[in-house]
Every structure is written in structure tokens, then in C-alpha cells.
Regions:
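Short, exposed "boundary/linker" segments that immediately precede the start
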Residues: 1-5
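Alpha-helical interface subdomain recognition
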Residues: 6, 10-55, 59-60, 64, ...
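Short Ser/Thr-interspersed hydrophobic loop/turn segments at strand-loop and sheet-helix junctions
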Residues: 25, 48-53, 145-146, 162-168, ...
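Short Gly/Pro-enriched turn/cap motifs at secondary-structure boundaries
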Residues: 62-63, 89, 104-107, 131-134, ...
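Short beta-strand-to-turn element immediately C-terminal to the catalytic PLP-Schiff-base lysine
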Residues: 75-77, 117, 143-147, 162-164, ...
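A short, Trp-centered hydrophobic/proline-enriched beta-strand micro-motif
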Residues: 92-100, 144
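Flexible, small-/acidic-enriched active-site or ligand-binding loops
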Residues: 111-113, 166-197
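A short core secondary-structure module
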Residues: 122, 126-172
Length: 358
């Protein structure tokens, strides 16, 4: 039984499940075998995540977030950094996170004000990050920092720095009261004169924004699978209900209006799955496409919200109570149109690139 089913309104974090997932090879699927991963692709990663999200969105999100940002090491890390940080993540022995969002820097990433000043052989970091996955449970964070504030190019002012969470000055406050995904850890982070060696710079100084965009071009492809999995799970629940529930002397699944709803839901899910798989396949072929990835993320999030709404409607009044799994899926769906790039940001990307330079 999924943990959130047993305790639907309790924030849970089960480290033993992460370790078990690591033992089974479900973590770090896209991490090279040389660094403890399975050496597979983003498509395989997406398929695994879809199946987790189909059953338990909260636990699925926690398992996905364990390696959230690992792409940065593969793309821009030194050999020493890869050897040090990636194997424990792939094995489920270490948890990472990516601290990007700030109180005044959400979709406007370049407004991030958390500063990292090079002081001798160390970076001194100060600032706050909000709504960070694994912020109070992670062993290390990738922190998006302002390192070159005087550069006239906004896109060259930031860097990504590795920060171990046991360093003095790192504090985290676990957030409670989330609408959904309560089995995953989310926290606000406070960095007060946190010192890390300059070797903790990931990639090049001033190249943080470009590196972040490269990450989003990958993560959004498999995050699209979150929406596909949640939608499929909601459809599964709806079908189980309409096959057993009777009204007017008939199974409600026998009514044409019900069948039409199911047909629309199933079609949307298959379309979302197809474009999500296309986005991941292109990445695995070295042909990643920013527009396709944005389309996949935007459409799968919309599909999740629309499908789970219809699925709950088919449950009638029963679906409104928390002893029904569909209620948990309903609460989890909305974030898929918000995190990892709000749907409006994805539309901006798609529209701008489709129209071309004016």
C-alpha cells in the first residue's frame, strides 16, 4: 500500500524506500555506468518515472528528486566531481537537490540574488532559496549563485556551485501544508557565510544560466512523464470505479456519456505519452529539441489536470473524500503546470521559437 494512502495528510519521508530503489536500479538510470548508474537513456528514465507516478505521485516525486540535477555533473562536471558525487546518488546512499528558486526569482531566474564571492581559495555564499526539493533532507545541493554581478550581460552573471548541507551556515526549514506530493521533501534554505572550496564550482564561472538551460532541456522531457503517469493512474482509478458502480440499474460505465469521457481521457494520455517519449528519444540520440521538450512538459501537465478532473467527476461525491485515491491524485496534479517551468514559460519558449526573430 502506498505510504500516502495510509497517511494522506501527513508529510512523510522514507529514506529506506530510496535505498531500496537504489538497490533495484531505479535511481540514476541515465547516469553512466562508470559513475554507478545504469548507463541507460532519458527514455528509460521517463518510462520508470511514469510507472511510479501511475501508482503514487508523492513517492514518485521523491524518487525522481534524488538525482535532480545530476545532468549538470555529466555535462559540465570534472572527473573528480563525477567520481565523488554521482555514485552515492545512483546507489541511493546520497540525496541531492538543485537550489534555484528565490523569493523574488521564480520564472525570472536571472533575478536570483544569492551571492557567491571568491575569497581566497573558497566561495563565500549568502542568500535564501525557497521551495527546494530535498532542501532539508539532501546531502548536497547545487546552488544557482550570483558570481559576476557587474557583467553587463545578465545571462553571464551566475554560476552553479556544489554545497554540502553539513557545512556551517547552511540551514533549512521544512515546508508543510503542501497541496499535494506530501511524501516528497520541500524546504526553504538559508545560506549565511557558507564557505566551500573553489573546486566546488560546477562548470565555468559566469556560465551558470547556460548550464541551467541545458539542464531544463533534459529534465523537462522526463518530467513530462510525471503528467503521463499521473493521468494514466487517474484513468485506471476511474475505470475501476465505473466498472463497479451502478446507477439507474446499470453500471455507469455502460452509459455513452461515460464512454465518451473515457475516450477523450485515453486519447489525451496517449498523445502526451507520445510527445514525452519523442522528447526523450531525441535527447538520447543527441538531437535534443527545446521546443519539443517544452511542448511535452506543457501538454502533459495540462493533460494531467484535465484527466484527473474528469476522473474525480466520474467518482461523484465519493471522489471528494480522502479515503479515495483519486483525491490524492487530484491534489498532486496542479503542480505539474507550475514546477520545472510554469506552463506560461513553456508557451513563451514555444511561441518565440516558432515565430522566429522579429
Amino acid at each position: 500500500t502506498p505510504y500516502p494512502t495510509l497517511f494522506p495528510y501527513t508529510t512523510l519521508f522514507r529514506s529506506e524506500l530510496i535505498k531500496k530503489a537504489g538497490e533495484l536500479g531505479f535511481l540514476g538510470v541515465f547516469i553512466d555506468e562508470a559513475y554507478g548508474g545504469a548507463g541507460l537513456g532519458f527514455l528509460e528514465h521517463a518510462i520508470i518515472l511514469e510507472e511510479f507516478w501511475r501508482v503514487d505521485p508523492g513517492l514518485a516525486q521523491q524518487l525522481c528528486s534524488v538525482s535532480f540535477g545530476a545532468e549538470e555533473f555529466l555535462l559540465f562536471g570534472t572527473e573528480e566531481q563525477k567520481q565523488k558525487f554521482l555514485p552515492p546518488v545512483a546507489e541511493g546512499k546520497s540525496i541531492m537537490g538543485f537550489a534555484i528558486t528565490e523569493p523574488d526569482a521564480g520564472s525570472d531566474t536571472l533575478s536570483a540574488a544569492t551571492s557567491a564571492v571568491l575569497d581566497g581559495d573558497e566561495y563565500r555564499i549568502n542568500g535564501n532559496k525557497v521551495m527546494i526539493g530535498n532542501g532539508s533532507e539532501g546531502d548536497f545541493m547545487l546552488v544557482f549563485c550570483l558570481t559576476n554581478p557587474e557583467d553587463i550581460r545578465r545571462s553571464r552573471r551566475h554560476s552553479i556551485i556544489i554545497v554540502e548541507t553539513d557545512r556551517p551556515g547552511y540551514e533549512a526549514d521544512t515546508l508543510h501544508g503542501k497541496m499535494g506530493l506530501r511524501a516528497s521533501n520541500t524546504a526553504n534554505i538559508f545560506l549565511s557565510d557558507v564557505r566551500v572550496p573553489k573546486e566546488n564550482l560546477l562548470g565555468k564561472q559566469g556560465n551558470g544560466f547556460a548550464q541551467l538551460m541545458a539542464f531544463f532541456d533534459r529534465s523537462r522531457a522526463y518530467v513530462a512523464a510525471h503528467g503521463v503517469g499521473l493521468s494514466q493512474g487517474a484513468l485506471d482509478l476511474a475505470i475501476a470505479h465505473i466498472r463497479s458502480r451502478e446507477q439507474f440499474g446499470r453500471k455507469i460505465g455502460s452509459f455513452q456519456s461515460t464512454q465518451f469521457k473515457i475516450a477523450e481521457m485515453a486519447t489525451k494520455i496517449e498523445l502526451a505519452r507520445t510527445i514525452a517519449h519523442k522528447a526523450c528519444t531525441l535527447l538520447d540520440q543527441g538531437k535534443g529539441n527545446t521546443d519539443i521538450t517544452a511542448m511535452a512538459k506543457m501538454y502533459s501537465g495540462r493533460t494531467a489536470v484535465e484527466v484527473v478532473d474528469e476522473a474525480l467527476q466520474l467518482h461523484g461525491g465519493y471522489g471528494y473524500f480522502n479515503d479515495q485515491d483519486i483525491e490524492r491524485f487530484y491534489r498532486a496534479a496542479k503542480v505539474l503546470e507550475i514546477y520545472e517551468g510554469a506552463k506560461e514559460v513553456e508557451k513563451m519558449i514555444i511561441g518565440r521559437n516558432t515565430i522566429g526573430k522579429l
